[in-house]
Amino acid sequence: MTCVGIDIEQFVRDPYGSGIQRVLQQLALQWPVDGPGADFVVPLDDAFGLLTPEQAAGLLSLAFVPRDPGADLRHIVRDHLVALDPTRVRAGDLLSIYDAWLLPEVSYLPSVLERFELFAKCMPTAMIGYDVLPMSDPANYRFKPGTAAWVSEYFRHLATADAVVCISDYARDGILGRLRRDPALPISVAHPGGDHIEVQEGRPPARPLFTRLGTMEARKRPLEILAAFLEARRTQGLEADLLFIGAPSASDEEINEPARRASASDPAVRWVQGASDDEVRELVGRSSAFLSIGTEGYGIPVLEAVRLGTPVLFDGIQPAGDLMSGHGARRIDGLGHHGLVSAFEAYGEA
């Protein structure tokens, strides 16, 4: 029987509950019992641990469950991995175990990319394609010194892997266009779903609440959202609240500081970090509107908000928003400052 090795070292090294890591979690949870065999492969001490899909699902889900404030998720993941006591093999044995190799997460780790290069010489390789934004919009990304060459190496593999499955048409078009992937090589689109959340009725509060979910990244326009909200309150008398849910930018403190300052000084602005799945669902489900503005490779939170019964207001490159337009999501004039101010005013009175 065919057996696939799935490399999840990136998750173990940097677990942070992103949309990409949600895809990994669902990949493990939904791996077909009648499909090819699969091991989720992780470095473990001086060997590699081989996790079953069930074991991997439990490990990957740790990024989305409640934990004590200040707890180091990397340590939690490491302790859980050791407790699983998975089958261990030497690095040299991996090549003889697998018939194909899958890299399911964006990774600029030299160890991950060098391993992919080695396996590509011996067997079919596949990747999940999320976007090419670091190549098409480099101004939005600040990589640590010495990382640039590995960023390029990751995208080189995305252009040459034997097969790529993309999360959206936008991702596929970027890989074919920007990366110039040979269109004769297999490349397909499989949209992530939102059915990990049960359909619910929305529970909006009496005072309008606008919620934005995701890491503070320039491409998602958190500062533009904040500036428009504050102006709508100041000039239009908007009586509403704004909630940010998500981690701070790891590379751009200039994005974090204004949001941190506003949440500390203005009771109408809140910023919740480190929220679990249950906490996110409660907060989004009790919002008046969910904001998704800017550029997304796909936008799983849009699907989650729709299933929680919370109307979605979106603008920009939003594949999931476009899919759900007219079905719980609405495109607004949200890329310009004045349009976003007007949207806050209009929907704050609804």
Predicted regions and their residues:
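Carbohydrate transferase catalytic cores enriched for Leloir-type hexosyltransferases
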Residues: 1-350
